[in-house]
């Protein structure tokens, strides 16, 4: 199984990456750190834009884990930017058959913050034909989900 972890955190080895390693323990997976790639905002035309590379990595994966710290009560900007850029660029259903998991962690997020982030990721999965596997917010949940993978 080809597993891709998309790390939206600017800290490549921080809490988001740590939860991913706990979730994916015992599995081979590839990490794509969004901070390593130039991805312009929706409507920008940057010559060095790497969104097509990110999309190609998603298309090659069987399972996708998107990780984001909670910033300003929601998903971080780098993940939001990628989701925004999918609009019009990627056909609905083009990621059909893939499973999407969402790592969403922060220093003490309130329930409504987690619900808002999860709503976004559920809609993203649904729009592009993916099965939504669930949201992981802490070590205990990562260990529970690991058993299902």
Pin down the residues of each PLM region.
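N-terminal beta1-alpha1-beta2 submodule of the flavodoxin-like/Rossmannoid cofactor-binding fold
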Residues: 1-92, 122, 126-149
């Amino acid at each position: 199984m080809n597993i891709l972890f998309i790390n939206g955190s600017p800290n490549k080895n921080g809490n988001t990456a740590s939860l991913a390693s706990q979730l994916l323990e015992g599995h081979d997976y590839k990490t794509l750190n969004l901070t390593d790639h130039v991805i312009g905002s929706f409507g920008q035309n940057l010559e060095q834009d790497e969104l097509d590379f990110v999309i190609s990595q998603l298309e090659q994966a069987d399972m996708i884990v998107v990780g984001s710290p909670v910033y300003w009560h929601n998903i971080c900007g780098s993940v939001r930017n990628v989701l925004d850029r999918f609009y019009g660029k990627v056909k609905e259903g083009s990621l059909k058959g893939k499973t999407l998991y969402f790592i969403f962690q922060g220093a003490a997020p309130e329930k409504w913050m987690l619900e808002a982030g999860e709503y976004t990721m559920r809609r993203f999965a649904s729009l592009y034909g993916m099965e939504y596997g669930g949201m992981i917010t802490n070590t205990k949940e990562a260990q529970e989900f690991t058993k299902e993978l």
